[in-house]
């Protein structure tokens, strides 16, 4: 009962696994489309065919158990605590979009001083808004669908680590000092909306109509 009261009671495991697999599939689809648009589809094919890629992928999965505390802490705050509060006040969709904005601002320091350099910081922040809102929609959908906090925890972990694997660098250095330009933002917005944003039309986001008295 205590675990249930604090949102720690896992459940709906079949749906939970499907949500995680769906995320992995969508994440890779985004990689494929981005590679095709950048004329690097053949390079991505080589990465996928490289056994090292899959060794690193399974290594990342094992590392989840060593770094779970950080991701659990974030998601317990974002998805379990803050999301329902914002949804109650701003609606099922509006609350999640607002949460995505808050989540974006949370990343502000690393947008300027880690992911890129200060001169590109504002573009990086705009890109972060695109990512956090669209990915936040999918994570909110997965959580509302399963009522299992471990689903967004695992998705958050995978999102942060799969770029290291499927970029072909196999190093976290790929996340640092990125070149992010304003001209890249519109395409990123469209792509992320197509990959993750469609969930906003699914049943968990449907507002319940109040019955007439």
What are these regions (language model features)?
Residues 1-18, 33-51, 70, 196-213:
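Membrane-helix interface linkers and caps
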Residues 20-21, 64, 68, 97-104, ...:
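Residue-level signature of the transmembrane alpha-helical core
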Residues 24-32, 101-110, 157-169:
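Aromatic-anchored segments of alpha-helical transmembrane domains
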Residues 37-49, 112-120, 171-179:
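Membrane-interface helix termini and inter-helical loops of multi-pass transporters
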Residues 63-71, 134-137, 189-202:
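Hydrophobic cores of alpha-helical transmembrane segments in multi-pass inner/ER membrane proteins
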Residues 72-100, 114-115, 144-148:
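Membrane-interface helix/loop boundary segments of multi-pass membrane proteins
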Residues 121-181:
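Functionally important transmembrane alpha-helices
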Residues 157-213:
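C-terminal membrane module of polytopic membrane proteins
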